[in-house]
Amino acid sequence: MGKPRGLRTARKHVNHRRDQRWADKDYKKAHLGTRWKANPFGGASHAKGIVLEKVGVEAKQPNSAIRKCVRVQLIKNGKKITAFVPRDGSLNYIEENDEVLVAGFGRKGHAVGDIPGVRFKVVKVANVSLLALYKEKKERPRS
């Protein structure tokens, strides 16, 4: 049975198109409201949090490495996430109970590369850019 044809089939076409849209992954994501329910950031691009602990995440096969990450509890809703710390030696600038700014990490909410389950990265530590600390342009504020 093909699609209905004829003069009075417009309503049928419109209704069928409306139903079929839900099969499109991007349409469903945009219209179900899961962006606010499932996303720890609640639809925002960045979020602040407190560092709970430093963790090493093992890279997926065929790579062999321990990727340096931190467990962060978000201030806005108390959710706990794992965030990647980019660049070599940057973990030394982060201590437990520091306030960090966390951003998304590529791929529309999916894990990136060989780091399983890590969807966020650290951008700032104690209100100072992690890149500036790494390049030694700025120092950590004395507490």
Swiss-Prot record:
InterPro entries: NA-bd_OB-fold, Ribosomal_uS12, Ribosomal_uS12_euk/arc. The keyword Nuclease does not apply. Residues 1-23 are annotated as: Disordered. The modification 3-hydroxyproline is found at P62. The keyword Disulfide bond does not apply. GO terms for molecular function: structural constituent of ribosome. Keywords: Cytoplasm, Endoplasmic reticulum, Hydroxylation, Ribonucleoprotein, Ribosomal protein. GO terms for biological process: cytoplasmic translation; translation. Its main location: cytoplasm. SUPFAM superfamilies: Nucleic acid-binding proteins. Residues 1-19 have a biased composition (Basic residues). GO terms for cellular component: cytosol; cytosolic ribosome; cytosolic small ribosomal subunit; ribosome; rough endoplasmic reticulum. It is found in: Cytoplasm, Cytosol; Cytoplasm; Rough endoplasmic reticulum. Hydroxylation at Pro-62 affects translation termination efficiency. Belongs to the universal ribosomal protein uS12 family. Component of the 40S small ribosomal subunit. This is Small ribosomal subunit protein uS12. It comes from Drosophila melanogaster. The gene is RpS23.
